[in-house]
């Protein structure tokens, strides 16, 4: 049975459906400047697909923790040790629980490091637990930066490696990547290039428009 998500309407008033089965078999990139509706679109996608598929959201700003109230997502405090994050990620895959990894309030280096550890543990789960999971990463340019920033090389390596695994090899392990960014030019090319579907919103900067054209 096919399940379609109603993503909105066209200028003619026709519904715009998104096939969940197709989404789980591919990778999606959502791009648009601040205020273009990315968070609204992601929220719509998550709320409408929640009854049908397990979800894991990497949430740097705390925008998605309220999914717990209506849909029962487990909210995970991102300020944990490496061993704790790995253990939780393993249980999430084993028990097929939808979750939100809340990184709000952590500095950027700790956000990158802990998100990377969590995603890598999801990726490294035993084969018997490779059930389909919709993995949504908001502000993806933070976790897969195109250039080195002010964070340690260790944090950048862990985070970028996890994002690369998700987008390049995750599908075979049941992980369907959905990444959202407001600065496409700041997102690592090898991560963005793996997306097979694109939803493009309002974009102002020439450098981002040039990347989108690529």
Predicted ranges, named:
Residues 1-17:
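N-terminal pre-Walker A segment at the start of P-loop NTPase domains
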Residues 2, 13, 59, 138, ...:
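Residue-level signal for pocket-adjacent positions within structured domains
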Residues 16-20, 29, 43-121:
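Switch/coupling segment of Walker-type NTPase motor domains
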Residues 24-25:
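Pre-Walker A (P-loop) beta-loop-beta motif of ABC nucleotide-binding domains
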Residues 29-36, 46, 116-214:
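Conserved P-loop NTPase motor cores
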Residues 39:
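Walker A/P-loop
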């Amino acid at each position: 049975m096919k399940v379609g998500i109603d993503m909105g309407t066209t200028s003619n008033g026709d519904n715009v459906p998104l096939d969940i089965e197709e989404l789980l078999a591919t990778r999606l990139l959502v791009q648009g400047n601040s205020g273009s509706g990315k968070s609204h679109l992601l929220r719509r996608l998550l709320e409408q697909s929640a009854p049908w598929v397990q979800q894991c959201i990497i949430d740097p700003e705390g925008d998605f923790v309220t999914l717990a109230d209506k849909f029962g997502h487990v909210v995970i405090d991102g300020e944990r040790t490496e061993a704790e994050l790995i253990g939780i990620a393993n249980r999430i895959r084993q028990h097929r629980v939808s979750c939100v990894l809340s990184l709000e309030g952590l500095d950027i280096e700790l956000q990158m490091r802990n998100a990377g550890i969590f995603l890598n543990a999801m990726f490294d789960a035993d084969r018997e637990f490779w059930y389909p999971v919709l993995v949504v990463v908001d502000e993806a340019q933070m976790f897969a930066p195109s250039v080195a920033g002010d964070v340690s090389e260790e944090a950048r390596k862990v985070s970028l490696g996890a994002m690369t695994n998700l987008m390049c090899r995750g599908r075979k392990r049941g992980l369907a990547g959905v990444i959202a960014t407001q600065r496409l030019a700041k997102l690592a090319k090898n991560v963005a290039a793996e997306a097979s579907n694109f939803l493009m919103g309002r974009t102002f900067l020439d450098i981002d428009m040039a990347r989108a054209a690529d």
